[in-house]
Regions:
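Active-site loop-to-helix "anion-binding N-cap" substructures in soluble metabolic enzymes
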Residues: 1-408
Length: 408
């Protein structure tokens, strides 16, 4: 496999995998119902199957994370094992450990053709921090586990923009290649970007604001964003930067984040579109209002109909549309409207379309719109950054691993 710059990356087809013990970094991070703790969408788990089938003669150890420390999606991986077992119709071994003695013994005892899923990688403190590849290789996680494996397969494209030990560390120590998901994503995205037409409309939502701000700037600078339509928490940040929301949003480093949004608006005043009306939750009921009517303490849960109409017109005139992140609290029935209507507008446009992120792919499936989209990716932030032309840490690790392999 070659990336868009012609650099060779090894794939599963470059290795003899028979009876090899494989470290398989997947991304099974799924949307979780905040009230029940149940998995809402299994798309990322389903996608893992094509790679697992290619590894049918190996001893496979799946490593993934779920949520972030401190949020309500931070869970163990036992339910993921149950879902995968049901999807594949076969036993999936599970160990409630990541790098300890139980995990190590489970890996050592694995037989040819068996699959083992480790617990949430972020239970290991090191996995919550970014490292250079060289330092990642020195972490306890990589030092302890790498000696148990023959090959590292990196297939967690949604996490490819992170420099975590499991993503960049093992490739320093082991022969490494891309899995089928990464192979497909890179090939399809590179093909699409060669034919993408202006105007480019980017619709951004969700809650991962700091990552988005830098990506927005790069997308604009690289000619990938003629219009940026803002929804979700990032939309609130930009409305706060415009002084259209008076009350603090209660997010980490809010002053710094809002200042960056304000700077972007100043540098690119004709690019950004923010909501004109919204919906809040008032005593358990959906209440729609003009943005100017927002009171202190009101929490924005969705877009209003005027914003949907405004954004839909911009989408209908686009040559290329990219949407990432829900427009609101779509898990709640009363606040699905904005996300649903944005996806309808994208699906019914004549543009080349890309839908990105675990939450949106779940919503897209629920609405039966998947067949109308050119490319669907469970990656969110990684895909946004890839479209800017920036080198993703995972891809760089795979390139370096390929160079080492060829040098032997």
């Amino acid at each position: 496999m070659h990336n868009r710059k012609g650099v060779k990356v090894l794939t599963l087809d470059d290795f003899d995998l028979d009876s090899k013990t494989v470290f398989l970094r997947m991304d099974m991070n799924c949307p979780i119902d905040p009230e029940t703790g149940e998995i809402l969408g299994t798309k990322r788990i389903e996608e893992a199957i094509v790679t697992l089938e290619s590894l049918k003669d190996a001893k496979v150890v799946i490593a993934s994370h779920q949520g972030r420390v401190g949020n309500n999606e931070y869970k163990g991986m036992n339910k993921h094992a149950e879902v995968l077992e049901k999807l594949m119709g076969r036993e999936i071994k599970y160990v409630e450990d990541t790098i300890g003695e139980s995990a190590q013994n489970a890996i050592k005892n694995l037989q040819k053709g068996e699959i083992l899923l480790l617990d949430n990688l972020r239970l290991c403190a090191e996995e919550n921090y970014e490292f250079t590849p060289e330092n990642a290789a020195k972490t306890i996680m990589v030092s302890r586990l790498s000696k148990l494996f023959d090959i590292c397969v990196l297939d967690s494209f949604p996490s490819a923009h992170r420099s975590h030990p499991s993503i960049v560390g093992f490739a320093q120590k082991l022969p490494s290649c891309a899995g089928r998901i990464v192979e497909r994503e890179v090939r399809n995205l590179d093909e699409m970007m060669t034919v993408a037409k202006a105007p480019h409309v980017i619709i951004l939502g969700g809650s991962k604001v700091p990552d988005r701000l830098e990506a927005i700037k790069l997308l604009i600078q690289n000619g990938r964003a003629d219009h940026v339509l803002l929804t979700g928490l990032i939309g609130n940040v930009f409305m706060r930067a415009q002084a259209r929301i008076k009350s603090p949003l209660g997010i980490k480093n809010e002053d710094e984040v809002v200042a960056k949004a304000h700077s972007l608006i100043g540098d690119y005043p004709d690019v950004f579109a923010t909501p004109v009306d919204i919906a809040i939750d008032r005593d358990g009921e959906r209440v729609e209002m003009d943005v100017r009517e927002i009171s202190k303490g009101d929490k924005i849960f969705d877009l209003g109909p005027k914003t949907v109409e405004y954004y839909s017109k911009l989408i209908s005139g686009a040559g290329t549309v990219f949407i990432s992140g829900p427009a609101g609290f779509f898990e709640k029935e009363d606040f699905k409207y904005g996300t649903s209507e944005m996806l309808n507008a994208v699906a019914n446009s004549m543009a080349t379309t890309i839908v990105s992120g675990g939450h949106l792919t779940t919503a897209l499936k629920q609405q039966g719109l998947a067949d109308k989209i050119n490319h669907i990716s469970t990656a969110g932030g990684a895909l946004v950054l890839y479209l800017t032309g920036e080198k993703l840490p995972m891809i760089k690790s795979l390139e370096d691993a390929a160079e080492k392999h060829r040098a032997k």
